[in-house]
C-alpha cells in the first residue's frame, strides 16, 4: 500500500531534505583537505619543512576519516528515511531540524457573530474524529490520540517531534487520551488562542499597565495586586471591595489546586482570557466557540439531569460545577490531575457527596424553578470553555 501524502506534507518533506543536504554539505566542508605544497604560491615542497608538513596533513586526514564516514552513514540513513517517507528521527538531528510547531492564526469575528446560533436539543449531532493525523496528514494503522474537545487526532511520534510530548507527558497522553477524562490537543489546551488580535492587544495593554511580567508565575499577593490594578478607576488606590478581594483569593486557590503557593503563567493567562471573553463577547458569540463534542456533552448532561425540555435551576447550578470534577486522587489511573470535560456519573460516591453538598448550599426555591435548553446552554458555555485545558486548575470558578 502506498503512502498517502498531502501538499502540506510534501512541503515538509522537501524542507527536511534540504536540511539533510545542508548537513551533508557541512560535513564535506568540515573535512580537512590534503594540500600539496607545489600547488600553492610560496611552496616549500622538496624541503625538509615541506615533507614534515605533508606527513602531518596525511596523519590528520587519516584520523578524521572515521568521523567523516560516521557522519556520511548518518546522512545516508536520513536520506533513506526521507525517501521512504518515514521522517526524521529526533535523536539524530538537532531540534531546529524537527517538525516546526504550527504558527497559530488568531480568529476573526464574523458580522453575524452576535446572532443566536442554531443549537437544538434534538436531534443529536454525530461526533466523528478525523481519520488522518493533524500534523503529518497521513493515515496509519497505529493508534491515534484523539482530542477530547475537537475532532483532531495525532500520532505520539508527531507530537514528540514537535516538542509537545516531553518526558512523562507521553505516558500521560497514552493513559488519558482514550479515557472518559480525555486529553486536549495543543490548539484547545490554550484558551488564549480564542482571542482575536484586537482582544489580545487589549489584554497585553492591561498587562503592561499593571506591570505583569509574562511567563512568570504569580503568588497570591501578586494576583490580588493585579486584580486591584486591573479594576482601578480614577485616582483610587483601592479598586476591590473586601468581598471582591476574598473572591479573588478563592479564584487563586482554584488556579493552584496543588497548593504550591503560586499560579503558573499558562493558567493565569487562560483565566484572564476567559474574563476578557466575558467582558467583550455577547453570549451568542461564546456559543459559537463550542465544538460538536462540547455541544453533545451539554446535551447529554441536560437530558440526564432534566425533565424533558427543562431542567431545574439547582441542577443547572450543579452542572456549572460538574464540568471541573476531577477523578479521585487515590485512583491508580489518576497520577496526573486533568480537568474533566463533563459531569461524573451520578452513581459515583464523588458525585453523590458533591451533589448533596451543593444542594445544601442552594435555596430551596431554586429547586422549584426550571430553565429551558437555550438558557442552560448560555449559563454553562463559559464554564464548558474553561474546562478545556489539561491543567488541573479551575480557570473560572463558578459562584457558590
Curated annotation (Swiss-Prot):
Pfam families: zf-RING_15 (PF16744). The modification Phosphothreonine is found at residue 47. Residues 29-38 have a biased composition (Basic and acidic residues). It comes from Mus musculus. GO terms for molecular function: zinc ion binding. A zinc finger (PHD-type) spans 129-190. It comes from the Eukaryota. GO terms for biological process: detection of mechanical stimulus involved in sensory perception of pain; gamma-aminobutyric acid signaling pathway; regulation of G protein-coupled receptor signaling pathway; regulation of synaptic transmission, GABAergic. Keywords: Lipoprotein, Metal-binding, Methylation, Myristate, Phosphoprotein, Zinc, Zinc-finger. GO terms for cellular component: glutamatergic synapse; synaptic vesicle membrane. A lipid is attached at residue 2 (N-myristoyl glycine). This is PHD finger protein 24.
